[in-house]
Amino acid sequence: MSIRVNSSYSWHSWPRVFKSAELMTIQERTREMVRAAIKRLFDIDLAEISVEVPPRTELGDLAFPVAFELAKRLKAATGQKQNPREIATRLAEEIRSVEGIARVDVAGAGYVNVYLDRAAYLTSAVPEPEPVTPQLGGKIIVEHTSVNPNKAAHIGHLRNAVLGDTTVRMLRSVGETVEVQNYIDNTGVQVADVVVGFKHIERRTLDQIKAIDEKFDYHCWDLYAQVGQFYEEDKSRLQLRTDTLHELEAGEGETYELADYISQRVLGCHLETMLRVGIEYDVLPRESDVLHLNIWERAFNLLKERGAIELATSGRLAGCWVMRAAEEEDVNDDEETEHEADKVIVRSNGIVTYTGKDIAFHLWKLGQLDIDFYYKPFYRYSDGQVAWITTTNPNENDPAHPRFGSGAAYFNVIDIGQSYPQRYVKLGVMAVDNDQRVERSAHLAYEKVALTPATVEQLGQRLSEEDRQRGAIGMSGRKGLGVKIDDLIDVLEANALVEVANRHPELTDSDQNETAHKIAVGALRYFLLKFTRNSMISFDFKEALAFDGETGPYIQYSVVRANSIFRKLADAGIDTSAADLNAVSRERIAELFAGEGGDDLWSLVYLAARLQDTLRSAVAALEPAIIAKWAFQIAQRFNLFYHNYHILSEPDAARRALLVAITSIARRQLIAALAVLGIEAPERM
């Protein structure tokens, strides 16, 4: 059976399920009004109606270019040319009297520009938003981080983890149920190499490894770099790696026991590191358990039964189980095995490839193998949540564990270099389970993180003049070249602490440290999230440590400013409740919005109230940068508001109530957006 690799296939076809939300945003409500008007006027059902937000409020709050599409439809139906502007005029008349709309204009060749009733919109935006209803109707499994448990995690791993964690937060913000998985490749080459290092370079026994009292993942970082040099000195030593891999896959013996200890201890270090930036996990599935619990064997048999794979009997892949590509698939035959047209699932030496094990794991994710792991607690977080780890030992199974797997969809955060094998993983899963769950699943690809030349030199690496002229230099674990996450956080916290101590000497040491930590996390997470997933990041210490401009601390400071406003108002005995605004008539609110500075005030309200639209756009595109950009925009808008309007000294009670309401909305939405980004604003900065 030939499996077609469709290079034009969209991994993002799943977001259709989010387009019928019960809790409608302002854009969706207005879109429905327009859709109903089109049905009444022209008896046409339009499934998709595009809506735009004009760049300036004087041009309207929403713009609908739908008249152009209607003109085409009507011409096709009647054979007569239709004027889009005339169609737009009829639509404008139809929706002009709808509640919530203040004015409708026709602009240009046929745009319908809608101006909202600002007073009505503001009063509806002041109360807390209602809970969001989930749309998918099942659990989404998000797999992220998945750092090889062989050494300390670096900044490139953190981009994966922060993207994944933010995706989880995005999905939960629109009401979805999410299970967070961190797949542990404890039988791969990287773990095997560290085992070789301990056994054949340091010549340590398991007890001696257990006795290492320095930071264990850092020790392994240095050792891993030594192993690369160890192989370079004598290529025959690579046989040690091959032998070790076989022993790891066997799942027993001294070498396996040593590798199991190393991988679990390093994994514990990774969880501690990720917790520093607010990242937690539900379950830690281990690759060794995929192999030893017959999960791979069950999947292997299904793949053979469905004709998805076949045994190659000739050529250089003879003896391998491969997934055949379609004849028309355009792949260079000279490429390495990882990217050749016929994807190897089991090598001729019997070793299952990463792709093969991944297919099995994803079939389990969707509940297609009628088999499960055993589970035991591995790490308990301070909030009581437990990170469970898989095991093959039924005696270790804790029956209190939640039900894992059996998802309605899965999303994998894996770097863009794995796009080709990930395509085959999905094709393998589709060969067994070709339904909506697979269609809704996606590979969240992202570009890697490189280092600026200045950063490399700060790490103590010598560069040639040619390297110094380059914009970015790739990290290399085998060379020990990279920025460890813990080191980076330490530097960020130290820098932030200096500023906090200078500005707030009255705070206790504990409060200063907590504030510095929140600022450091805000700076780091925002730096990694403000770039779109397909943008390569050239990591630079100076830029990451900056607190001005488009940075996390800049946005955090906006919340701090809003909080300070409410503290001062409370100290002055001024009412800041929603009831204060309710005492102001809609007519008076409309006057204030129509008066001097009214457009600026409205633009802040309107931008703040569009958070839900922004979240839905981010979920539909699986792009956290959309939220990051929105947060920065509203922080800019609010800081301008803060400088231009002085609430405490405002003599007009109605105007003051309006300014308080706007501050409350902006603060609430900023805090909500930062929470989705995994950032918390400190009380003071």
Where are these regions (language model features)?
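Flexible, low-complexity linker/hinge segments
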Residues: 127-135
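Non-catalytic interaction-recognition regions
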Residues: 5, 9-122, 134-685
